[in-house]
Amino acid sequence: AYYVSPLGRAKDTASLTLKKACRTAETCSWLREFAPQAVHPGKDSGHCVWDWLPDAWMAEPKYFDKDHWHETEVFQNAHVKEEYDWVTGELDRLLRRHGYVRNGLFYRAVAPNEDTIVLFCHFGVECVLLSHLLNISPMQLWHGTCAAPSSVTVLYTEERRSGVASFRMSSFG
């Protein structure tokens, strides 16, 4: 199953794969670039949340915490958690359609399968999706990884116990 951002760059990238595979993609608004604009320390205007100077974000321990990264004044003012919850909620709805239901920090494999799910999206939102699936702060992904345009990230589910699935990333970018 193929899903694509409504934005041009991702649609253009998807078009080549879709044409070769003779497939179509469902457009999902939540796959657009992650939108919140935060006023970074020492700045006067909003900027994307995934492009900070290292000393600015690394000085705040909360940014490393999967449960509290969004609780800083900067992110609260930018409504980052609300956007994060919307995006990850939509991801969970999509995964439910494919047989995986979020249960705390893992997924229940209610209809285990070998579906391949392909998402054509953008770096900022990719890191949001990965942070949710891997249970880590997106700040570490936004600032510790780099995915060039048209890069491919691969995840799979691991079901070591019947009905319990977790996601593993086998390649990034």
For each predicted feature, which ranges?
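Internal catalytic-core helix/loop-beta-alpha segment
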Residues: 72-106
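Beta-strand elements within well-structured catalytic alpha/beta cores of enzymes
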Residues: 3, 114-121, 125
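Acidic, low-complexity terminal tails and accessory targeting/binding regions
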Residues: 34-52, 101, 105-116, 127-173
